[in-house]
């Protein structure tokens, strides 16, 4: 049970940063963040630097506090498009090789 909680942030960050690279979803995500936090973030720069990743995550937290359903919808749509386009590698989502304690 502990493993499930420990692996969640790692999986979430891999899905988040691969999802943010999608062009269509990037525009939706950028407008969502601008609506809720009044910040105009460059997503391509945010994903490539550690400081940018921290800013992106804090902006998404603020956005989720303001409008949770829209934020979740945009992120799930981004993840779906990333999987469909093959941007998320199978090693990140392959649960069959994991050893549970």
From Swiss-Prot:
<comment type="similarity">
    <text>Belongs to the MG439/MG440 family.</text>
</comment>
<feature type="signal peptide">
    <location>
        <begin position="1"/>
        <end position="19"/>
    </location>
</feature>
<keyword id="KW-0564">Palmitate</keyword>
<keyword id="KW-0472">Membrane</keyword>
<dbReference type="GO" id="GO:0005886">
    <property type="term" value="C:plasma membrane"/>
</dbReference>
<protein>
    <recommendedName>
        <fullName>Uncharacterized lipoprotein MPN_650</fullName>
    </recommendedName>
</protein>
<feature type="lipid moiety-binding region" description="N-palmitoyl cysteine">
    <location>
        <position position="20"/>
    </location>
</feature>
<keyword id="KW-0732">Signal</keyword>
<feature type="lipid moiety-binding region" description="S-diacylglycerol cysteine">
    <location>
        <position position="20"/>
    </location>
</feature>
<keyword id="KW-1003">Cell membrane</keyword>
<dbReference type="InterPro" id="IPR001595">
    <property type="entry name" value="Lipoprotein_3"/>
</dbReference>
<dbReference type="Pfam" id="PF00938">
    <property type="entry name" value="Lipoprotein_3"/>
</dbReference>
<keyword id="KW-0449">Lipoprotein</keyword>
């Amino acid at each position: 049970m502990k493993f499930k909680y420990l692996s969640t942030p790692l999986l979430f960050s891999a899905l988040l940063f691969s999802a943010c690279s999608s062009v269509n979803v990037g525009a939706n995500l950028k407008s969502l963040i601008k609506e809720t936090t009044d910040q105009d973030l460059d997503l391509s720069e945010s994903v490539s630097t550690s400081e940018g990743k921290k800013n992106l995550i804090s902006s998404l937290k603020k956005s989720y506090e303001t409008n949770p359903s829209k934020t979740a919808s945009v992120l799930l749509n981004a993840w779906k498009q990333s999987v469909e386009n093959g941007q998320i590698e199978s090693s990140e989502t392959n649960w069959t090789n994991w050893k549970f304690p």
